[in-house]
Amino acid sequence: MRVVKRYSWLWVGLLLFLTASIAMLLLTSNQRPSFTTATWIWNAKLISSQTEEIVSFAKDNQINLIYLHIEPTRVSPQAYRAFIQKANEANIKVEALGGDPNWAYTANRQSIGDLVSWVKAYNQMAKVDEQFSGIHVDIEPYLLPDWKKDQEKVVNQWLKNVDYLITETKKDGKLQVSADLPFWIDTVTVPGDSEKVSNWMLQRLDSITLMAYRNHAMGHNGIVDIVEKTVAAANSAKKASVIVGVNILESSEGSNVSFHEEGTHEMKQQLVILQEELAENPAFAGSAIHDYESWKHATQREEQL
């Protein structure tokens, strides 16, 4: 009887162990993927001589997405291939970055077509681990003089060009399409409709990066305050589609739009608060820091103190 009793306890222990293991497995499988930490590299010439340095900085700061400017006349395809391969080794995705306020005009649609064509031709020639994972545009039509004169006309052409960008990009291949948008884009409506431009973009693009350039996460006019409506509106799609961007580039637009004075430590603290506040939103995908060079210079200044 002692033997039977002893083995019965072993079976009970084994059963408890298996139950706990299955529970942990289910819990792990239900957890959402890690958040995105992105940055912009506008001066693509840097990758020709600083690939190791950039990737090392990215790893140190948990960057897993880079928007890399396309400059075919200054940077060779070989340089792009070498950089993307190194980035992929570090589990960092790279999206092709392009854009100009004038790209909002349908008369300048060819510039969008040229970017898409270049990226597709590049990817066809590159190995899988050397390819761009998507196209990311920064158009900012509100910088045009016409935005104040005839906003409806500009918005109408802008949306047509975004439709064109998506159609051309998605014709073949699996490239993602994303865009930078101002945090206040939810106050602009589609011409002839009551739909918000923010919702229009979210329905069509794979993701958006909201330029929520503030240096505090909480409180009135803080980062959470100015993005939460757009994030909430995107939740119904049940996909991580909204990246929240902050700025560390020195700015003359005001004392609260950049972390240039506060520094990288304070910026990271505020981004932790941002993530904690928005983590339960399915649409919240992570954060982006503008831009790599400014972030790197700020880090170097702090290291010298």
State what each model feature region is:
Residues 44-59, 108-126, 189-201, 265-278:
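Short, acidic/polar
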Residues 50-74, 128-131, 207:
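Catalytic domains of carbohydrate-active enzymes, especially glycoside hydrolases
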Residues 95-102, 158-195, 239-250, 288:
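Aromatic-lined carbohydrate-recognition surfaces of secreted/lumenal glycan-active proteins
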Residues 24-61, 179-183, 249, 287-294:
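Boundary/entry segment of secreted carbohydrate-active catalytic domains
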Residues 236, 240-305:
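Substrate-binding cleft of secreted/luminal carbohydrate-active enzymes
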Residues 65-100, 149-179:
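Aromatic-lined substrate-binding rim segments of carbohydrate-active enzymes
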Residues 63, 72, 194-224, 292:
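Aromatic- and acid-rich polysaccharide-binding/catalytic face
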Residues 67, 119-155, 285-289:
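Active-site groove signature of glycoside hydrolases
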